[in-house]
A protein has these predicted regions:
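Phosphate-rich cofactor/ligand-interacting catalytic cores and adjacent structured alpha/beta frameworks
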Residues: 1-25, 61-220, 224, 246-251
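Long, hydrophobic/aromatic-enriched structural stretches that serve as scaffold segments
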Residues: 15-67
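Residue-level detector of well-ordered alpha-helical segments, enriched
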Residues: 30, 49-53, 89, 159-167, ...
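Conserved phosphate/anionic-ligand binding catalytic regions in large, soluble enzymes, centered on
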Residues: 42-56, 225-241
Length: 251
């Protein structure tokens, strides 16, 4: 979307990285600062979803508590998000202005003073937004589904890009993309998911150089229709990041 190319994402990532990992800031402040820096570097919303997913992971990874795993530390951090976190996260979302984000009443991001904990706001949004659902479930989609898919794919190919393509298609086939649903409706999101399922023979158990050509045709068709599975892409990035933080051999 927005006529973006790989350079937009690279510049946004460079700009956001220091803020995502800033140990002096709470989760909400990291989200806002990273989004502001990304926007200043590119002028468009390139990575709001990535920032929302990666900031809590980065904070959890830095917690000094060797007795618990990354997911447990993440769950504690998510449960402690407060009104300040909500205010800053909402400000970041308003700045990025993701497509199709309408007003929904309580917990609406257009509120400058949300007066509820960030995790409460995520509970209100979880049925229509998969990133909100991730906050509520301590990143269930990543830990229980996406990480195992990526790990299995890495065991079957030495080409990391093919493993990532496998992960992308598996997520697309498993979960309706929130970005498509917001912008074009649930029917459009469901149809994209079903098409990804129909292409299963081209990406299970792993994408190959030959099957990748078929998947490129699918990608071209989505672009022609203006359908951008942006939330799926956010989860791909967050899964790779989570795998690296977990110490899994992903690259």
């Amino acid at each position: 979307g927005h006529g973006m190319d790989i350079h937009h994402f690279e510049r946004a990532a460079d700009a956001a990285a220091l803020w995502i990992a800033d140990p002096s800031l709470k989760v909400g402040a990291r989200i806002l600062r990273a989004t502001e820096a990304s926007f200043a570097a590119t002028g468009v919303n390139t990575n709001l979803g990535i920032v929302l997913l990666c900031v809590p992971l980065a904070k959890a990874a830095a917690e000094v508590d060797a007795g618990t795993g990354l997911r447990r530390r993440l769950a504690v951090i998510l449960s402690m998000l407060d009104e300040d976190d909500a205010g800053n996260a909402f400000a970041a979302i308003r700045l990025a202005n993701p497509a199709g984000l309408g007003q929904v009443g309580k917990g609406d991001v257009s509120s400058a003073n949300p007066r509820l904990m960030l995790i409460e706001a995520m509970h209100l949004a979880r049925d229509r937004d998969r990133i909100a659902n991730a906050y509520v479930t301590a990143f269930e989609d990543i830990f229980d589904f996406a990480l195992p898919v990526l790990s299995d794919a890495r065991a079957l190919t030495d080409d990391f890009s093919l493993a990532v393509s496998t992960l992308h298609m598996a997520l697309l086939a498993e979960i309706e993309d929130s970005h498509i649903a917001r912008k074009y409706g649930r029917d459009a999101a469901r149809q994209v998911r079903e098409r990804a399922q129909e292409l299963r023979s081209h990406w299970r158990p792993v994408v190959t150089p030959k099957s990748f050509e078929h998947l490129k045709e699918f990608d071209t068709k989505l672009k022609e229709l203006g359908l951008n599975p942006g939330t799926t892409a956010d989860f791909v990035v967050a899964t790779i990041f989570c795998g690296l933080l977990s110490g899994r051999k992903q690259t």
